[in-house]
Amino acid sequence: EDVKHDILQTFDKLNETFISNEIPVIVGEFGLLGFDKSVDTIQQGEKLKFFEFITYYAKEKQLPLMWWDNGQHFDRINFNWRDEQLYKTIIMSLGSRSSTAKTDFIYIKKDAEIKDVDVELNLNGNTLIDIKNGDRSLEKDKDYCINGNILTVKSDFLKSIITNRFGVNATLICKFSAGADWKIDIIYYDTPSLNDMEATEEDFFIPTAFNGTQLKAMESIYKKSKKNTGPNEWTSFKEYNLVFKPANYKIILAPDFLKQLEDGEILLKFYFWSGEAIEYTIIKNGAQIKGISSQADHDKEPDNTYLDEPDGDNKNQAYGENVQGEDNVESYQSE
């Protein structure tokens, strides 16, 4: 809502000051923080809602938008969009509003009771006409029901599609009377596991079993003083893909982040889109970093064999038991 308010305020002012006085305005660049570094910096559903609204409202206020892309989203060699859902959302918003939802995922935890799940829709004047799981249309009032703007996915349907495989077990495609489709991933997961580690600033990372979850955010404070660490000490939250990022079986902390920390104990708190929050302590002594998990058995020696494990292919998506996905994410050392 804060972002929406900023867009309304800015575009209204531009229209009032310039457009209404017959002075043309072009928005020459727009986007999201870290959007040019990785497609996973901003969660997919939140990304789509931003671009749906800004495209719609720019048209309402007669403000042409210029898409400024470094090749992250538009493949300049093969001339196609890497994310078709993003492209369709933007293009369709030029003609009519697309429907969105408060979330584009439903997390089902291992061994937890599976109940009906409510998803709040933002219909934007449209109506829901169909929900598909693959080629099959879900049966209204049996698999799901709709009451106003509340979509309820029934527990029996969720039970029927959940397997013992961590990650995305199904993707529901919601179709509306106008605009782009909205996808909802059904994700089976367990609490992620962060483990102890010892290494230098250059080599340190946190051995992690994601167990189907997606990494959302990280806070960093000095344990004794409770002050925020750098960079950008005005907030305890650190920038995704600049300070930290997920990879195969690990969370990587940027060497530059570790180097600028003061010696002593630093408390990190990792948030996951499943709702889990896990604390992790690092102790810095010169160039040496020791990581202590709030979950780990500290009588065991740290397993530094992780240092020899290749990064592999990964993405901030819940597609593997421990691995966050399928697309390559470069290591900090190679950037």
Enumerate the predicted regions with their spans.
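Extracellular glycoside hydrolase catalytic/binding regions
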Residues: E1-T55
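Surface-exposed, short loops/turns at beta-strand junctions within beta-sandwich domains
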Residues: F157-V168, P255-G264
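Solvent-exposed, low-complexity, repeat-rich "mucin-like" stalks and linkers
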Residues: G95-S137, L194-E233
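Low-complexity, Pro/Ser/Thr- and charge-rich linker/hinge segments at domain boundaries
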Residues: I186-P207, A287-D299
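Aromatic-rich peripheral "rim/lid" segments of glycoside hydrolase catalytic domains that contact
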Residues: K37-D130, G134
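Extracellular/luminal ectodomains and secreted, surface-exposed scaffolds of diverse proteins
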Residues: R136-K154, W234-Y249
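A short beta-strand micro-motif common to beta-rich folds, especially ectodomain repeats
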Residues: F166-A178, G264-F272
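Edge beta-strands of extracellular beta-sandwich domains
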Residues: A180-D190, E276-A287
